[in-house]
Amino acid sequence: MCHRCGLSDEDLNRRWSRPDQTLHPVIYNAKGLIEYCCRVLHRIPYFYCDLHGHSRRKNVFFYGCSQAGSWNAADRTVPEDPTEFLLLPHILQQTAPAFSLNHCNFRVERGRESTARVALWRQLGITRSYTLESSYCGCDQGPYQGYHLGTYQLHEMGRNLCEALRTLYEDGWKLKLVLACSSPQTFANEQPNRVVGGIAGLGGVRTYEEEAVLTNPSDDSDYEEEYHAMNECH
C-alpha cells in the first residue's frame, strides 16, 4: 500500500479540497488551522510547502501554482505577478546544489485540485504554495551528479530552503527588480508557458541561465510518479 494512504485506504494528498473530519482527521485539522489563520486572524501564510519523495524524476524540485498555467480558463484571465512564486526557486537554483529549476513545474491540472498545494492556493490565497520533491533516483547535475540523496543532502536542502526564505523575505523587492529587468519579455506575458530569467548582480549570487517550465505536455504529472510499481496504492 502507498504510505500516503490513511486508514480509509485513500490517498490523503487528494483530500485537501473537502476533507472529512472522520475519514481524514489529520488533513481536516491541518487545513482548519491554516484556514483559521487566513479567515479569522487575517494572516495569510507567507509560504506553504508539502514535502514529498519522487520515484522517477531526479534531483530536488518544486511543483507550484500559476494562474497562467492553469487548466481553468477563468484562472488564465486573472493578472498575476509571476515573481511572487518564481523567486524562491530561482534563489534555490543559485544556492542549493541538489535543486533543479529546470525540473520545476507550475502547471495547475484539473486532477490536482484536491492536492494540498492547489487547494490552499485556490481556496485560501496562498501564492507561494509548493510541493518540494526529493528524488529517490539521485541527481543528474551539479556536485551530486551520479549519487543518491542521503541524509546529509536532505539536511543541506532543508538549510538551503530556510536560508532562501530569509533572503526572499528580506530582499525580495530587490530580486524582483533584477529578475524583471534581466528578462522583461517574460513578465510582459509574451510567453506565459515558459519562464526564462536570471538573478544576477547581487553579491554572492551566480547568474542563472536555465529554464523553468510552466507547462510541458511531455512531463509526467506528479500522481503518475508516486511509487507506481512497488508502492502502488490499492
Indicate where each model-derived feature is located.
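Structured catalytic-domain cores with a bias toward divalent-metal coordination
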Residues: 1-234
